[in-house]
């Protein structure tokens, strides 16, 4: 290997596992096998993101991750989700403590909500961000607080069902929080500040159409870096839409077809002519009168 090849190798992002090796049998037997596989992968990574579609059991996965990582764990969730997570934990025989500040933390799994993060200083062994798409804002106060407060926490897990696949800001902020790289490092490595491009199929031929650059604020992935970008993402993030993505059966996870049944409601006392859409109801009081 010559010096230049060595130079290029050293430029490559390296993300090392900092977690623990476990066996699938260490996971709670109530979990599905695909969930156990994800838990095993995440515990081994130590710092990672789990982007699973709705209904695939992110809550059970994050709870098992916290249990197997050990020590003092803090789960941060939206206000409406915290107590729901406590109830879900009871289904797999785990006890969660709802805490409001750092003085209430105990050994084991603790949970709080995002509105209370000013009461914590990051003195935990592991941190879980539930609904981690809250990191999306590039300059948001909560995003900055989360990154700064928990920068030195060894074990980190992000969970959300809705990462924007074409939103470099959200992807970069997840990588920044997890300690993979900063948002700017990701942009400089894989993206270029240029007009976004869209592929259009016209009469069987593919064309590339350039879009707006919005005053220099738009970034697009470098064409030659696409494979490396997704290879890099797979080193710290797990994406899954259904169990078959990991080779398992989708039985029990396939939704029935959606049937849309229109219901026409006659509105007494309200008539409008020469309009396409009826807009004669003004406020709640009018809507209450509709019979």
Residues covered by each model-derived region:
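Conserved P-loop NTPase motor "coupling/switch" region that bridges the ATPase
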Residues: 72, 126, 143-245
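Inter-Walker segment of RecA-like/P-loop motor cores
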Residues: 93-118
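Conserved Walker A/P-loop ATP-binding site and its immediately adjacent core
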Residues: 59-92, 165-171
């Amino acid at each position: 290997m010559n010096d230049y090849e060595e130079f290029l190798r050293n430029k490559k992002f390296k993300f090392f596992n900092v977690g623990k090796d476990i066996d699938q049998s260490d996971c709670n037997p109530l979990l599905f096998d695909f969930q156990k596989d994800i838990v095993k992968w995440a515990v081994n990574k130590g710092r990672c993101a789990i982007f699973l579609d709705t209904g695939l059991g992110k809550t059970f996965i994050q709870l098992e991750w916290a249990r197997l990582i050990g020590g003092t764990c803090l789960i941060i969730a939206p206000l409406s989700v915290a107590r729901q997570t406590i109830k879900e934990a009871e289904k797999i025989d785990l006890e969660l403590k709802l805490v409001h500040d750092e003085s209430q933390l105990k050994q084991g799994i603790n949970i709080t909500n995002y509105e209370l993060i000013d009461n914590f200083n990051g003195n935990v062994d592991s941190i879980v961000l539930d609904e981690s798409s809250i990191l999306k804002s590039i300059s948001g106060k909560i995003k900055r607080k989360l990154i700064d407060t928990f920068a030195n926490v060894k074990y980190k897990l992000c969970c959300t069902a809705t990462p924007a696949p074409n939103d470099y800001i959200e992807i970069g902020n997840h990588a920044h929080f997890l300690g993979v790289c900063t948002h700017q490092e990701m942009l400089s490595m894989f993206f270029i500040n240029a007009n976004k491009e869209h592929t259009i199929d016209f009469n069987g031929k593919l064309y590339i159409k350039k879009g707006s650059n919005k005053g220099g604020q738009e970034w697009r992935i470098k064409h030659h870096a696409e494979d490396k970008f997704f290879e890099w993402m797979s080193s710290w993030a797990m994406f899954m839409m259904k169990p078959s993505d990991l080779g398992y059966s989708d039985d029990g996870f396939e939704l029935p077809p959606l049937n849309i049944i229109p219901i026409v409601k006659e509105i007494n006392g309200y008539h409008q002519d020469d309009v396409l859409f009826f807009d004669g109801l003004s406020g709640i009081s009018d809507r209450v009168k509709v019979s």
